[in-house]
Amino acid sequence: HRTVLENITDPLNYAKKMNKEDAKRKAVELLQMVGLEEKAGQYPRKLSGGQQQRVGIARAMAVEPKVILFDEPTSSLDPELVKAVLRVIKRLSDQKQTMVIVTHEMQFAKLISDKIVFLDDAVIQEEGSTKELFENSENVRLRNFLQAISLDDL
């Protein structure tokens, strides 16, 4: 029952005690950052899944969190929408936003991560830098996983 803009300004008004004008200005900036400024007056239920996800990211960024948690941010999206969400997350990475991302998008994780933790059946199998895990892993389960998702041998 709240517009896209209201979904972002409400946390600013209530959690950050920001006045309405400043909250609106910041919300518009965040919508520009996620490429949805033209959707400010629409209701989230009218947006695509990828657009809804980007509104959620803008809302999270509004309160300037130290860490943002993403749990499979692209898993339920149509393939055409995945890239738009990944672009927004990459932009956050470029801005040095700390994030914890649960993902199967391994090439994306390789692109933006400083550290990767590989889990199997909820147990940490290996953790380290991107280079350590993708190039020098001695963990058989991780190597098998990376080989299974690789398109190199098609």
Language-model features and meaning:
Residues 43-47, 51:
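Conserved ABC ATPase signature
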Residues 62-66:
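A short, proline-enriched helix->beta-strand linker immediately N-terminal to the Walker B motif
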Residues 68-71:
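Catalytic Walker B motif of ABC-type/P-loop ATPase nucleotide-binding domains
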Residues 103-104:
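H-loop/switch region of ABC-family ATPase nucleotide-binding domains
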Residues 109-111:
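A short, surface-exposed alpha-helical micro-motif characterized by mixed small hydrophobic
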Residues 127-128:
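ABC ATPase "signature
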